[in-house]
């Protein structure tokens, strides 16, 4: 019997295997569950003004040092992205909150892709590589289940990455005081 915390929140009905899966290896990266050694990188990630620019701003390092657990991010749906043995970011797959705008289903609850990377990792294709690996894993675990992504239209890099990953615009709306781009991606890959 699996406990709720061993499966992706709200995704048990999709028949997902217990969390975490075996580490996912790409050409340059490893996607894996969080470990205690990742704590400093989590603090750095959430304290970064560049990372927080489109997320409501950074949190203070003091607040993070007090609040980040010994093993941060240890939850279903969160992959730490590792390069050469060190955390450089994270990729998440979560259920989109039904109370937020942006849905492709009448009953809401779509799986939403999220990601954050340390600024030193930007511009090298790591986010695309890690997100593609997480999406590939998810497509294998739950064939045919669509995934959504939401980002500020001002975040040009995120908009480019969404297109690279195959997300198609569904709508735009105002949220958090900014215009948001909302897209969807089918896990069904066209053959040819």
List each language-model region with its residue ranges.
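GNAT-family acyltransferases
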Residues: 1-120, 133-137, 141, 146-152, ...
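Conserved G/P- and acidic residue-centered "switch" motifs that form tight phosphate/ATP-binding loops
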Residues: 85, 125, 155
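Conserved active-site alpha-helix within GNAT-family acetyltransferase domains
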Residues: 128, 154-170
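A short helix-loop-beta submotif of the ANL/AMP-binding
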Residues: 120-128
């Amino acid at each position: 019997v699996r406990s709720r915390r061993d499966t992706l929140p709200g995704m048990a009905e999709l028949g997902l295997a217990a969390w975490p899966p075996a580490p996912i290896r790409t050409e340059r990266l490893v996607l894996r569950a969080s470990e205690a050694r990742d704590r400093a990188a989590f603090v750095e990630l959430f304290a970064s003004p560049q990372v927080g620019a489109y997320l409501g701003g950074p949190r203070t390092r003091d607040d993070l040092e007090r609040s980040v657990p010994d093993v941060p991010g240890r939850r279903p749906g969160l992959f730490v992205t590792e390069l050469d043995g060190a955390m450089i970011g994270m990729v998440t797959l979560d259920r989109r909150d039904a109370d937020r705008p942006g849905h492709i289903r009448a009953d809401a609850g779509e799986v939403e892709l999220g990601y954050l990377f340390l600024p030193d990792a930007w511009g090298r294709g790591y986010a695309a590589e890690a997100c593609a690996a997480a999406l590939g894993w998810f497509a294998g675990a739950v064939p045919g289940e669509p995934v959504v992504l939401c980002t500020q239209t001002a975040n040009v890099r995120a908009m480019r990455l969404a297109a690279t990953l195959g997300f198609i615009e569904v709508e735009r709306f105002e949220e958090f005081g900014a215009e948001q781009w909302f897209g969807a991606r089918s896990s069904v890959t066209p053959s040819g």
